[in-house]
């Protein structure tokens, strides 16, 4: 039962209506009424506002006259807010009798414009307000939409209406319809059919909706109109409007008027190829459309492309105003304007997708200049009568010229030259008849079908029509005259060449079209293609991001091809790079023209390629006014497009950028794009697919058991003969090549295959093969050479460090190396397994430990062993005293690492880069820490970038960097124990020669407390001692030889000066006695010995050449080489320093541990507190009062 009504103020309060965007059926009351309601503690949910006003009464028929005005009422709820606007002057509203108050003293009631339109109020209307504080309540409401369009909108937003109806409507009435707001751009009108209990609104004419009320919506479907034959016609349009919208009248225009359709130029995959062979110039329509009165019984129709005035090209001043005109120059070829209306045969389209599309044959599309275009608006109507049979006896064909003809060629009519050949007139006519009468190409020959005056003929190679031509009907004075060539006898003549002058439909404001890719050319992005296609077909826009070489343009080409072939979208590509340097007004006009063109050819997908080149992101310390202006113009154009285009999926946007950060923030944050799809670098399986596609696809084993043959398209042949066949070695696994190319983009892989193929060609040329048809075998070594020195596009300009360290060079640290492998190598090696892992992978590690324990060496070795790029950072590289410079260095550093991913970013001496905040007088390190916290945020994660930090004082690092999500795990590089020291010595001894009798365990026992760097110093010092011993022994040999002893160097006395067995270590000048001098070697003696050695080398080369000439070169060279190698090995074995126990003892005496015992204990306590935990004692926060103490900035 309805409760008894309790009114607020009993008198009506005059007010003026003010329209505002409330988006509900509630009103804002004047401040005077609000004060009364607030003082009485009345809830806003219990208030119903009654608005009443007077309007002129409608005229009545008959002698009786009614009242001059009538009263209307509207009921609404209260928002709980007062009006903010001042009242306006009344416009066209009646005034209340006896009211003497001025407008300035009257309040303003604010109401939404859509709701006001439904109830009949306008801006400035004068109303009376009556408040109902305790109105009757209803718990069940039956509503129905006003129109079928309202029902369709409500059905589309049923869930939103269910959740938000009570927040928009509070009072219901039978007196006027109500408005519901279902989306930012759509509203629907409803009316109340019945309420329960039925007597709730009977006494007052309105009721309040209970909080738990049930709302029942009755559907309202469209009424199908019946044709005159009594059958129902589909709701789809038989004669579509300019934008391809459906018409309610399914019978089509009557009386033979024009009918409009949306064109699909053939060939098209939705069209059967067999049907296309039925005619040369013809159009295809659904059989149901052929039954409408305008087209019933028509065999031929006139076809015209409708061009809107706003998109028409500017008129050509060189052309005459009439249809046939010429140039002012007597020597220039004649210009004939083609006909805009062409008569074509009308045929049924059995598998038509709907009733609004029309298929245009290939030749007709070429004549109308809409070849390979979807979306043009075509007007067709029944063709008028043919020309009388006696009026036309000649058909003249005027070929198009490739260029301007000379005067002699223009005057010479007996011999004409086309396509590089001289054609006699009779021969040319016969050739034209032959090519235009072929039935195998177009199904029906051109000359046997409908021939329209000034019909454009296609370009036919190896004929006088090599550039196309135009057909003229001699004696035709009727505009758009035509004849049926198969029913007439006429004389075919070939006229002189003319200059082409064809009207162009503005199909694209950019001359650069998207690349046309063959089927299956792009691989590994099926998910992105399906996602983008589904989103675009649902009237949402997509932003495609990806680095250079990721295949954005190729992917866009595939997506637009799908939309064009399967969903009949018109594609409008715009290359933004071409407009990047244009004037702002030119860019704005380009946007306007693109939007207008897209609306005309809708549904349309507008492709903005390289949008970040036109609208880059705003940067610091630079003027970004131009970018912001263009971004605002772009956003306004898109918003105007969305608000003006009706119907789902009319115009959508597909844009490509390198990253969402590279484009202006107004574009990404302006609700322009519904979805952002990122093209990342392909994984290992994806790279394998790209490599297979690049080499032509793997095939089964062919005739050769060792190779699998692949025929590649257009390979660079070694000769001018047949193209060679590229063969892939059977043992070559492209998966291994994919594992070596981590981080490569598809474009990089394509270039890599080209480099490998070039290496194979070079190898084949160097092999001296005379077989012109020899197959090229692409092997692993070709890819190894191609990868060597190759820098992917994403890494060009990125400074990377290289390290020669490997696992074998590192001893000890077994557990630490294991964790590093798990963190860095396993996600790359076992990518499919980790892709399904639900846990977040570690991306940051802290290496801490005693100085000299191998932290830096471990970090440099892990990058090379795991196949990752390596960037090393020291403190001074990023610290800068200027405000903002250090933060920019950190940002640039992480951007470099992201560009080089997978990459290891190594911070050495991390405690100097990121100390605890609050203890820096300049604040530089504090800002660096804040920036690093932002870059290493655990919520976002670092994709492909691993952070390694090394320090010996982890207690000095800011604790925020050590939390999970940043530096997830800390690894201790402890002092080596006995086993670790043996392992370290074993790794170091690989590059040195130690006496076999010395055991590494003995050295390890004597080096307790030594770090890895100390052990390296011990061995290197011992190696230096061994080198000194070798040098001393050689000096002793030289000294003994100089004293006449038998040393290593001696000369055979019987051989003389011309025969040299070997060169001695010391050969001084001979004195008068003929004995070698024992004086110390001077610069002169050294020069003489060098000259003697050079002479001996020249004699050896001459002897070698002499033996080669004698025909015994190979054997002699081999014997000499073996003797030389043997002598070098013996000499090397004799001179190589060997570390013995004496050298090690000497080294141990001079080498001490780099870490003192006290320092080692102190560091042990620090590391123990870092692992176990710190005490709860915290500083008081007061600044230090000591002399020289630093005060905190926090």
Swiss-Prot record:
SMART domains (UniProt xref): AAA
Annotated segments matching region AAA-cassette D1: 538-730
Subcellular location: Cytoplasm, Cytosol; Peroxisome membrane
InterPro entries listed in its UniProt record: AAA+_ATPase, AAA_ATPase_domain, AAA_lid_3, Asp_de-COase-like_dom_sf, ATPase_AAA_core, ATPase_AAA_CS, CDC48_domain_2-like_sf, P-loop_NTPase
Region (Disordered): 220-255, 1062-1084, 1116-1139, 1174-1194
Disruption phenotype: Leads to growth defects with sparse aerial hyphae, and reduced number of nuclei in hyphal cells. Also results in complete elimination of sporulation and trap formation and a remarkable decrease in the ability to trap nematodes. Leads to defective cell wall biosynthesis and increased stress susceptibility. Results in the up-regulation of the proteasome, membranes, ribosomes, DNA replication, and cell cycle functions, and the down-regulation of MAPK signaling and nitrogen metabolism.
Catalytic activities: ATP + H2O = ADP + phosphate + H(+)
PROSITE patterns: AAA
Signal peptide bounds: none
The UniProt record lists the keyword ATP-binding: yes
Keyword annotations: ATP-binding, Cytoplasm, Hydrolase, Membrane, Nucleotide-binding, Peroxisome, Peroxisome biogenesis, Protein transport, Repeat, Transport, Virulence
Residues engaged in binding ATP: 546-553, 849-856
Any one GO cellular component localisation term in the record: cytosol
Pfam families: AAA, AAA_lid_3, PEX-1N
Subunit field text: Interacts with PEX6; forming the PEX1-PEX6 AAA ATPase complex, which is composed of a heterohexamer formed by a trimer of PEX1-PEX6 dimers.
Family that this chain belongs to: Belongs to the AAA ATPase family.
Protein name: Peroxisomal ATPase PEX1
UniProt organism field: Arthrobotrys oligospora (strain ATCC 24927 / CBS 115.81 / DSM 1491) (Nematode-trapping fungus)
């Amino acid at each position: 039962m309805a409760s008894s009504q309790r009114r607020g103020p009993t008198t009506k309060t005059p007010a003026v209506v003010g329209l505002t965007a409330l988006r509900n059926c509630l009103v804002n009351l004047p401040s005077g009424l609000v004060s009364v309601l607030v003082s009485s503690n009345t809830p806003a949910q219990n208030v119903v506002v009654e608005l009443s006003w007077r309007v002129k009464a409608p005229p009545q028929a008959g002698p009786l006259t009614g009242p001059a005005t009538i009263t209307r009422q509207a009921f609404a709820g209260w928002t709980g807010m007062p009006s903010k606007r001042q009242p306006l002057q009344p416009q066209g509203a009646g005034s209340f009798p006896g009211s003497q108050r001025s407008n300035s003293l009257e309040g303003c009631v604010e109401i939404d414009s859509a709701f006001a339109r439904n109830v009949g109020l306008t801006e400035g209307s004068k109303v009376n307000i009556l408040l109902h504080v305790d109105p009757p309540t209803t718990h069940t409401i039956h509503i129905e939409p006003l129109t079928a369009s309202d029902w369709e909108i409500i059905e589309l937003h049923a869930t939103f209406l269910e959740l938000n109806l009570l927040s928009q409507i509070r009072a219901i009435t039978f007196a006027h319809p109500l408005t519901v707001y279902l989306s930012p751009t759509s509203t629907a009108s409803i009316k109340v059919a019945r309420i329960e209990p039925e007597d709730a609104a009977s006494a007052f004419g309105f009721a309040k909706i209970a909080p738990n009320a049930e709302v029942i919506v009755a559907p309202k479907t469209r009424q199908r109109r019946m044709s005159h034959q009594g059958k129902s016609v589909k709701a789809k349009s038989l004669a579509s409007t300019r934008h391809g919208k459906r018409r309610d009248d399914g019978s089509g225009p009557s009386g033979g008027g024009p009918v409009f359709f949306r064109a699909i130029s053939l060939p098209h995959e939705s069209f059967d190829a067999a049907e296309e062979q039925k005619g040369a110039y013809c159009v295809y329509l659904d059989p149901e459309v052929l039954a409408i009165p305008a087209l019933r019984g028509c065999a031929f129709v006139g076809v015209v492309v409708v061009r809107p005035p706003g998109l028409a090209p500017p008129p050509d001043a060189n052309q005459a105003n009439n249809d046939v005109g010429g140039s002012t120059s007597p020597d220039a070829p004649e210009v004939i304007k083609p006909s805009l209306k062409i008569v074509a045969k009308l045929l049924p389209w059995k598998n038509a997708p709907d009733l609004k599309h029309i298929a245009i044959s290939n030749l007709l599309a070429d004549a109308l200049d809409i070849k390979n275009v979807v979306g043009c608006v075509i007007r067709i109507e029944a063709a008028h009568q043919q020309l009388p049979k006696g009026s036309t006896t000649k058909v003249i064909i005027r070929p198009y010229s490739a260029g301007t003809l000379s005067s002699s060629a223009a005057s010479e009519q007996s011999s004409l030259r086309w396509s590089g050949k001289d054609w006699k007139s009779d021969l040319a006519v016969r050739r034209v008849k032959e090519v235009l009468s072929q039935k195998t190409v177009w199904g029906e020959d051109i000359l046997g079908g409908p021939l329209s005056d000034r019909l454009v003929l296609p370009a036919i190679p190896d004929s006088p029509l090599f550039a196309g031509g135009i057909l003229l009907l001699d004696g035709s004075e009727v505009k758009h005259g035509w004849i049926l060539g198969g029913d007439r006898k006429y004389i075919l003549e070939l006229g002189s060449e003319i200059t082409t002058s064809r009207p162009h439909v503005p199909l694209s404001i950019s001359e650069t079209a998207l690349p046309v890719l063959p089927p299956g050319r792009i691989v590994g992005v099926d998910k992105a293609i399906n996602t983008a296609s589904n989103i675009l077909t649902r009237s949402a826009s997509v932003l495609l991001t990806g680095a250079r070489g990721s295949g954005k343009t190729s992917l866009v080409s595939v997506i637009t091809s799908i939309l064009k072939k399967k969903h009949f979208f018109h594609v409008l590509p715009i290359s933004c790079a071409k407009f990047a340097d244009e004037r702002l007004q030119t860019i704005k006009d380009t946007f306007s023209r693109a939007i207008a063109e897209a609306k005309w050819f809708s549904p349309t997908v507008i492709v903005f390629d390289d949008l970040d080149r036109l609208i880059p992101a705003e940067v610091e310390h630079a003027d970004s006014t131009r970018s912001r202006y263009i971004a605002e113009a772009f956003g306004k154009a898109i918003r105007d497009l969305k608000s003006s285009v009706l119907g789902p999926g009319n115009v959508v946007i597909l844009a490509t950028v390198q990253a969402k950060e590279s484009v202006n923030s107004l574009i990404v944050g302006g609700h322009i794009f519904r979805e952002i799809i990122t093209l990342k670098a392909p994984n290992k399986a994806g790279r394998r697919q790209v490599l297979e596609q690049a080499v032509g696809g793997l095939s089964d084993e062919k005739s050769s058991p060792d190779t699998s043959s692949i025929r590649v398209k257009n390979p660079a042949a070694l000769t001018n003969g047949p193209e060679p066949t590229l063969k892939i070695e059977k043992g070559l696994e492209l998966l291994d090549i994919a594992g070596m190319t981590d981080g490569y983009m598809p474009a990089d892989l394509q270039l890599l295959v080209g480099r490998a193929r070039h290496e194979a060609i070079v190898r084949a040329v160097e092999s001296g093969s005379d077989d012109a048809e020899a197959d090229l075998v692409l092997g692993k070594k070709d890819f190894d050479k191609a990868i060597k020195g190759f820098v992917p596009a994403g890494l060009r300009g990125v400074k990377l460090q290289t390290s020669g360290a490997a696992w074998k060079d590192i001893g000890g640290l077994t557990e630490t190396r294991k964790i590093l492998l798990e963190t860095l190598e396993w996600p790359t090696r076992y990518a499919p397994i980790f892709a399904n892992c639900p846990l977040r992978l570690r991306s940051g590690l802290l290496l801490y430990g005693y100085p000299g324990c191998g932290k830096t060496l471990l970090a440099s070795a892990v990058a090379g062993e795991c196949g990752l790029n390596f960037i090393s950072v020291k403190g001074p590289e990023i610290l800068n005293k200027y405000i903002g410079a250090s933060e920019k260095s950190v940002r640039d550093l992480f951007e470099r690492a992201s560009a080089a991913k997978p990459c290891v970013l190594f911070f050495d001496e991390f405690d100097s880069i990121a100390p605890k905040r609050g203890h820096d007088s300049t604040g530089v390190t504090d800002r660096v820490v804040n920036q690093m916290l932002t870059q290493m945020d655990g919520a976002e994660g670092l994709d492909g970038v691993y952070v390694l930090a090394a320090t010996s004082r982890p207690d000095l690092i800011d604790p925020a960097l050590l939390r999970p999500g940043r530096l997830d795990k800390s690894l201790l590089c402890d002092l080596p124990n006995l086993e670790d020291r043996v392992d370290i010595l074993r790794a170091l001894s690989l590059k040195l020669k130690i006496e076999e009798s010395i055991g590494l365990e003995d050295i390890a026992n004597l080096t307790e407390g030594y770090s890895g760097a100390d052990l390296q110093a011990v061995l290197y010092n011992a190696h230096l001692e061994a080198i000194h011993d070798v040098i001393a022994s050689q000096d002793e040999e030289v000294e003994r030889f100089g004293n006449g002893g038998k040393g290593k160097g001696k000369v055979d006395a019987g051989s003389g000066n011309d025969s040299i067995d070997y060169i001695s270590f010391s050969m001084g000048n001979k004195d008068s006695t003929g004995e070698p001098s024992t004086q110390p070697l001077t610069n002169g003696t050294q020069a003489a010995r060098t000259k003697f050695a050079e002479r001996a080398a020249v004699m050896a080369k001459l002897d070698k050449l002499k033996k080669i000439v004698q025909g015994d070169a190979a054997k002699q060279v081999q014997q000499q080489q073996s003797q030389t190698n043997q002598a070098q090995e013996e000499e090397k074995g004799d001179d190589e320093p060997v570390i013995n126990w004496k050298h090690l003892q000497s080294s141990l005496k001079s080498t001490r541990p780099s870490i003192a015992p006290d320092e080692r204990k102190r560091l042990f306590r620090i590391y123990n507190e870092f692992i176990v935990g710190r005490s709860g004692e915290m500083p008081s926060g007061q600044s230090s009062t000591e002399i020289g103490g630093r005060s905190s900035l926090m």
